[in-house]
Each structure stands twice: as structure tokens, then as C-alpha cells.
């Protein structure tokens, strides 16, 4: 039991002794890949005016770098350290395979990967196969470099994007016009450098054109509706004017009818008053006629009665003439009333 307890401690101590005193320092620093800053926002204007013919490929260090040595034999894989293994618990000796191998220092610089921006170098006519040279001066294919990955950047002739269609759409629609801050020539150059961005710009332009067409159609429909409403308002205003004229005419006629009615009422009142006056006079005459005693055959009495009767007839004729001159209908004379009485 004691030997099994000391085994793991001895293993840990032996690992600590084999550890280096200071961490390994890399001689060469890591170069930042051009694919990370190739299409930055600050230098996009310079990239659009980029001329591939100005590149000096002889000055590139990754083309003249010697190939790394190839390992002929594979290193034996280190067996994982097990604290609870039977060998360490029983013997207390650390097996040689359980020690981690020392890291080997690697001398060399980071080579830029062609997988991220290989489309750009394909347009320039530069591939990694042409610039991998051996010591004898012969050019041959290197097997130790990173191969191009179609999953990251795709081919230029893939179905997702077609530069020819972009160039045709640019030359057909937007030639001579500047939309979204970029002309057709610069967009064509951008299509060669960054196809995805050019495709996105074209999609935005098409979407803006469609929205503009929808806006124009909607504005035209609104204008037609406004014109229709204006015509209806004009027709209704004419009808309202006609109705107002009819109403004013009816009001005038109503006033005339009211005036005629008032005149008729006044005439009726005058007739009633005249009838009352005649009736009172008739009653008075009846009373007077009843109070006169009958004569004894004297001619004086008859002459007096005839003179009174002629005076009454003259009074009735005068009243009839006055009524006819005023436009009132003629009324029966007092003689008629006396005869009827």
C-alpha cells in the first residue's frame, strides 16, 4: 500500500524535473495574414484602383522559403499517463513512454494561406504550384502546403455567383449613373476583387429599383383617386347649388302665400264686422217700427213713413257704393233686410 502511494508522487516529481526552465521563445514573429485586412474599410478605395501588373513576385519571401524537412519516420505516440495504472502502483517506477516529449523548436515564418484569397491570385495567374522551387531549380508540386479549400471561398464559376452576369447588369442598367456611392466601372472592378460584395450591392440596387417602382405606382393610384374625388366633389357642389336655389324659390313663394292668407283673414274680419253692424241696425229698425202706432187713415202718417223709408234706402245705396270703391264685394242693402224682416 505504501509503495502504491509513493508511485504517483515520484511520477509528478520526474515530470517537473524534465520541464524546461523557461518557456520556448519563437525567433520569428507571426505575420498577419493579408486575408484579414485585405478588404478593410480604410483602404477600399485603394484596392479598387489596384493594378496586378505592379506586383513584384520575386520579392515575396514565401516563394523563396526553403521547404521544411520531411520526417521519414513517425514518432511513437506517447501513451497517456494513468495515475491508477497497475505498473506505477506496483513498481513505483515511471515508464519511459509516459514522459511527454520535449517540444521541438520550429524555425520559419508563417506562410500566407492561399485558401482564403485564392480567387484573387487565380485572377493574377499565380498559383502555388508555379512558385514552389527546389534546390536544383526545377519546379514541381509541393505536397506539404495547404491545399485550396473550395468550401471557404468557392470557385469563380460556381452556381452561386457569376461575374459575367454582374458585369452585364452593371453595363446594362447602371452605366453612367452613380448609385449607392459607386459607379458601374468601380462595381465591375469590385466584382473581380470581391464577388460577394458586388452581388450584395447589385441585390440592394435591384431592391431599391423595385421599391421605387412600387412607390411610383402607389403615387399614381393616389393621384387618380384624388382626381376622382375632386370630380365627385364638383358634381355634388353643383347639386347643392341647385338645391339651394330651389329652397330660396320655395321660401319666396311661401312668403307670398302667407301674405295672401293674411289679406284673406283681414277681409273675413271686415265682413264679420260689417255683418254685425248691419244686424244691429236691423234690430234697431225693427224696434223703431214696432213702437210707431198705427195711423187713423191720415195721409200725414203715411207720408211720414214713406219719407223715412226713402231716407233709409238712400243710406243703403251710399254704403254699397263705398264698399264697391274699396274693392270689397257688394252686400245686400238695408231695404232688403227690411223687406225680409
Swiss-Prot record:
GO cellular component term, pick one: nucleus
InterPro entries to which the protein is assigned, alphabetical? bZIP (IPR004827), bZIP_RF2 (IPR044759), bZIP_sf (IPR046347)
What PROSITE patterns would the database entry show? BZIP (PS50217)
Tissue distribution is: Mostly expressed in dividing cells, present in leaves, roots and seedlings.
Q: Which parts of this chain are annotated as the region Necessary and sufficient for transient T-DNA transformation end expression? A: 1-162
What's the protein here called?
A: Transcription factor VIP1
What is one GO biological process annotated to this record? Answer: osmosensory signaling pathway
- According to the record, the residues making up region (Involved in homomultimerization and histone H2A binding) are 163-341
Q: Where is this region: Disordered?
A: 1-33, 59-106, 135-156, 307-341
Record's subunit section: Forms homomultimers. Interacts with Agrobacterium tumefaciens VirE2 and mediates its translocation to the host nucleus. Binds to VIP2. Forms a complex made of Agrobacterium VirE2, VIP1, VIP2 and single-stranded DNA (ssDNA). The interaction with KAP1 mediates its nuclear import. Binds to the H2A histone RAT5. Interacts with MPK3 and Agrobacterium virF. Forms a complex made of VIP1, VBF and Agrobacterium virE2. Interacts with SCF(VBF) E3 ubiquitin ligase complex. Binds directly to VBF. Forms heterodimers with BZIP34 and BZIP61.
Domain spans labelled bZIP: 194-257
GO molecular function per UniProt: chromatin binding; DNA-binding transcription factor activity; mitogen-activated protein kinase binding; nucleic acid binding; sequence-specific DNA binding; transcription cis-regulatory region binding
Task: Name the UniProt key words of this record, in alphabetical order.
Answer: Activator, Crown gall tumor, Cytoplasm, DNA-binding, Nucleus, Phosphoprotein, Plant defense, Transcription, Transcription regulation, Ubl conjugation pathway
Q: Would I find tRNA processing among this entry's keywords? A: no
Q: Where is the composition biased (Low complexity)?
A: 71-80
What up-regulates or down-regulates this gene? Transcriptionally activated during the acquisition of pluripotentiality (in protoplasts) by pericentromeric chromatin decondensation and DNA demethylation. Targeted to degradation by the proteasome by VBF and Agrobacterium virF in SCF(VBF) and SCF(virF) E3 ubiquitin ligase complexes after mediating T-DNA translocation to the nucleus.
Q: Which residues carry this modification: Phosphoserine?
A: 79
Where the protein is mainly located, per its record? cytoplasm
Provide the phenotype resulting from gene inactivation: Enhanced low sulfur tolerance with higher rate of sulfate uptake at low sulfate levels. Improved tolerance to heavy metal (e.g. CdCl(2)) and oxidative stress (e.g. paraquat).
Phenotype upon changing residue 79 to A: Cytoplasmic and nuclear
Q: Where in the cell is it found?
A: Cytoplasm; Nucleus
Query: Residue ranges of region Basic motif?
Result: 196-217
Effect upon mutating residue 212 to R/T: Impaired VIP1 response elements (VREs) DNA-binding and altered subsequent transcription activation
Annotated region (Leucine-zipper) at 222-257
Q: Where is the composition biased (Basic and acidic residues)?
A: 15-24
